[in-house]
A protein has these predicted regions:
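Bacterial Sec-dependent N-terminal signal peptides
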Residues: 1-22
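Short, small/polar-rich motifs associated with maturation and membrane association
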Residues: 19-146
Length: 146
């Protein structure tokens, strides 16, 4: 009976950690993922932004990000000379935490399957490595400015 209880607790904790966070709103600039809150905190570098309310309204260049457009997706254009924000690919992030580079990464419950995807370092909050479906997987929460 204890084994069944422990198994249930482990499975439920993994399921809860993989739930999508409805409060996070993603933004993309120069094919790099960030958050709307991150860019709002750096308004001086933003030239313009365009908000798409649903994945169906995304232009062709942003269709590959439709999986993170549950709450809409914002396309940000950064002013010339301000493109130097820290960035990291998910493969590099996996490598830093001892996880195989091609392993998907979870960001606020959204599964990023393509590990060549780049994210801005400013969006990163807590990073945890957890067991997910029998494999070590990186789980990332965004910084307090969502």
């Amino acid at each position: 009976m204890k084994k069944i209880l422990y198994s249930f607790l482990i499975l439920s904790s993994v399921a809860l950690s993989a739930q999508k966070n409805p409060s996070v709103k993603f933004a993309v600039a120069n094919d790099i993922v960030g958050t709307v809150g991150m860019f709002n905190a750096k308004k001086n570098i933003v030239q313009s932004s365009n908000v798409y309310k649903s994945s169906a309204s995304l232009p062709q260049g942003l269709k590959k990000y439709s999986f993170i457009a549950d709450n809409g997706l914002t396309e940000v254009k950064i002013k010339n000379g301000f493109e130097g924000l820290d960035r990291v690919s998910l493969a590099e992030l996996n490598s830093q935490y001892g996880v195989p580079e091609n392993t998907p990464v979870f960001i606020e419950g959204y599964e990023f399957i393509d590990s060549s995807t780049k994210i801005y370092g400013d969006m990163m909050g807590n990073v945890d490595v957890k067991d997910y479906n029998g494999k070590k997987t990186v789980f990332l929460s965004t910084s307090a400015i969502k």
